[in-house]
Amino acid sequence: MTSKLDQLREITTVVADTGDIEAVARLKPVDCTTNPSIVLKALGTPMFADAIKEAVAWGKKQGGNPDAVSSAVADRLAISVGAALVKLVPGRVSTEVDADLSFDTEASLAKARSIIAAYKDRGIDRDRILIKLASTWEGIRAAEVLQKEGIDCNLTLLFSKAQAIACADAKVFLISPFVGRILDWYKKSTGKDYTAEEDPGVISVREIYNYYKANDIKTIVMGASFRNAGEIEALAGCDRLTISPALLDELSKDDGKLERKLSPESRKPDAKVSVDEKTFRWMMNEDAMATEKLAEGIRAFAKDLTTLRTMVQKELQLAAA
């Protein structure tokens, strides 16, 4: 029998949401996605011990403000994780712009360009990388500019149709609408359990997928943030799905039949609209779940980024002793 993972690969591009080199080599995804949490976890493994030593040695040679040096070394380490993953996948690796820049378009642009330049220094072309930005108004504006420069973007922490519409208006390459974190919010809010078909996160991604296909929007829809295999199965046929190694393993061991749930041919009419800034902010204001989960996600990624920079500072201090 063919596993559900292999059946899924026939209709959806499978992406691994991890920095685990061993898991990527074993599971053979097309792409990989990373974020500050994933980078931090990867750097805690022996695989990246030499990369940490190299980055710290590089940092020691840099002059200037210690905080700026720590930040630069942290960036270098994130690129090291991404560069290792690029060697293992035929497609792209997503590297995230600092979460604490989520409300600063110009700073996000500068950081994105520096990420692309850092990869180029390692012989990795921009067509192997996706720049991840939070789906704030400012992040979407940065992506709009980057796309015109030939730098493809992955808009993350996306919880609402308003964000998806704004991303479509900006002609971004790919969006990552979240599933599991939406479910978390509704379970906490209502105290209910949900089947996969009732799952508010699944319903959200299906609505966004349908809107894009109904209006011939070329932006790729990549469902993200899964709590269980049922959510993944309920989105079978989505353009791409980025999945943790644990859930990829679960799907690889299940020989049941996988039914396609999404396809461009099954789209229903959904009138195309555009959003300006005030409309976007109002729609977000009216969506408590999207507002809260976006803010929470930015805070969590910023916290992990701070943890990484603190680790770097300690390593630099030890190296200087």
Curated annotation (Swiss-Prot):
Would you tell me the protein name for this molecule?
A: Transaldolase
EC numbers, comma separated: 2.2.1.2
Question: Record's NCBIfam families?
Answer: PRK12346.1, talAB
Q: Which GO terms describe its molecular function?
A: transaldolase activity
What's the top EC group for this one?
transferase
Please provide the Gene Ontology terms (biological process) for this protein: carbohydrate metabolic process; pentose-phosphate shunt
Q: Which GO terms describe its cellular component?
A: cytosol
